[in-house]
Amino acid sequence: QFRPSVSRPDYKHIAIVSDNRYDNGDGNFGYDFETEHGINVEATGKPGSKGQSNIGGSYRFILPDGTTAEVRYFADELGYRAESPLIPTPHPLPAHAIEQIRFAESQR
């Protein structure tokens, strides 16, 4: 039987320098961990009002220029939302575009 040779990337093992987790058994939980090269993740969760798990947390990592990037996030009955200076924000719509949208919606 023919088996093509597949080369595997040579990944360096990155050590986990801290790893903490808890689960209270009532839907409340949390975790955080950090790697030796600066990745840091933390989150906490609790039961939501509609049967879902609500979770909020953040992750940080080092960019190639040496600065730290951070993203904070929330997920609940309203959906997933992330906040970070890294995430582009849309430019405000001009007044004429907003008026066109309102007019189009009124024509439905």
Swiss-Prot record:
One annotated Gene Ontology cellular component of this protein: chitin-based extracellular matrix
Domain Chitin-binding type R&R: 26-91
Tissue spec. comment: Arthrodial membrane.
GO molecular function terms listed in the Swiss-Prot or TrEMBL record: structural constituent of chitin-based larval cuticle
Keywords of this entry: Cuticle, Glycoprotein, Pyrrolidone carboxylic acid
InterPro entries per record: CHIT_BIND_RR_consensus (IPR031311), Cuticle_Struct_Prot (IPR050468), Insect_cuticle (IPR000618)
Record-listed Pyrrolidone carboxylic acid modification sites: Q1
Coiled coil: none
UniProt keyword annotation of tRNA-binding present: no
Domain of life (superkingdom): Eukaryota
Residues of this chain annotated as glycosylated in UniProt: T89
Protein name, as recorded: Cuticle protein AM1199
